[in-house]
Amino acid sequence: MDLISLGGGFNAGLRVDDLIICLLFFFFFLYAAQNKKTKVSKIEFYFILFLFVTFLGSLFSSTQYGRGTVLFPIRFFEYFVFFYMGFFLYKGGANIRKLLLLLLIANSAVAILQHFGVVGGFNVRGYQPNMSERVIGLTSGPWELGVILNFITCYFLAEEKSEFKKYIIFGVATLIIMMTGSRMSLLAQIAILVWYMKLSASLVTIIKRCLVVIPLLFAVYFFFGDSTVATRSDSLMNSDNIDLLLDSYSSVRITESVPSWGDLGVLSRGDEVDASWSMRGIKWIYAVKLYLSHPMYWMIGVGAGSFGNALDGGWLRITTETGIIGLLLFVMFLMRVKRLSPTMSLCVIAFCINMLMIDIYMSYKVMSMMLLLAGYYHKKRKDEKARLRENNGSEILFHNKREVL
């Protein structure tokens, strides 16, 4: 139940769990103050600036045009608390491998039961008894489950020592992603595998891995060739998708308040146009035209939350709602996260691909998981650097003593 509604067609407002997370941040802040930790990392610095620009754009749009809400940036602030949770998980010696393995097993088991119609699932509209067409596991939607499985795959590809276990986990995660019907998550799954194979091995090892992976991908396609992903993609590569988007641009008119997407309609109801593209296209046209209508929007956006629950295009949404400044700060934040470890490098690749067609940076579970992992690896890297400096200092001291003697 919402304590404060965000309005604008959002599925959730500010709830009790939001207050609990804010309380956790207060304890983290007290810990930092007690230990005199005043220096912030580049990751924190860029995200704080992103929050500031998001707040500024929302304040301007909400006061001048009644679009967006200044409460919306609170949700992004809340996500970042998970960064500090990850920090303390590593500090406390938590086994992140077991946690992610449990997450994979639990979601896979529920997803398989959903696929065969044994159980339903809780999505943004409450409990749904039949989720067999597009499974959601323990998440709020198939798009969330797909990205969560991408992240789990990233971890085990980068960290798991056993090649056999790596590809078993990759295979299981890919099968479940096929059941979700999420095309972006499937594309990300293939991309992170290719990137991992390219960076982590010699040519001979890459060839050996290809001999394992290619048959695995063919097996997945053979057994799930008529899956939801395949069915939804029948008209994806049709040139009519682009033609209709361009033809419809001039017919869309911007208004003072953003209309509901239902009022705007779709590009086409014909079978020759991809259904997902048809729904997204009309939203994207409106978002672009509104963004270009005022010079201030170019820099700080039309206001976070202006486009309601889903624009179905993360990169477009973050550009139009937070402007060029917000986009650049968010990209700089991601680049810093990418440098933390091989796992985070793969996670950022998966995240960026999913952002093409999904407002995934607004997803509670996805952002909390990515930032939790980022905080975990940030602390790990920090400790490793400290140990390296300590060891180097000890070696220098040892050599100096020998020279004196």
Regions found by a protein language model. Give the residues of each.
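N-terminal signal-anchor transmembrane segment
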Residues: 1-34, 54-61, 349-353, 369
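Hydrophobic core segments of transmembrane alpha-helices in multi-pass, intramembrane catalytic enzymes
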Residues: 17-25, 71-84, 143-158, 183-196, ...
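Aromatic-anchored transmembrane helix interface
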Residues: 17-19, 43-55, 63-88, 99, ...
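Hydrophobic, aromatic-rich transmembrane alpha-helices
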Residues: 20-36, 150-159, 286-289, 298, ...
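Hydrophobic transmembrane alpha-helices and their immediate junctions
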Residues: 45-48, 164, 194-210, 315-355, ...
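Alpha-helical transmembrane segments of multi-pass inner-membrane proteins
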Residues: 97-122, 138-199
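A membrane-periplasm/extracellular boundary helix in multi-pass inner-membrane enzymes
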Residues: 109, 115, 200-269, 290-293
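Long extracytoplasmic/lumenal interhelical loops at the membrane interface
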Residues: 121-124, 136, 259-325
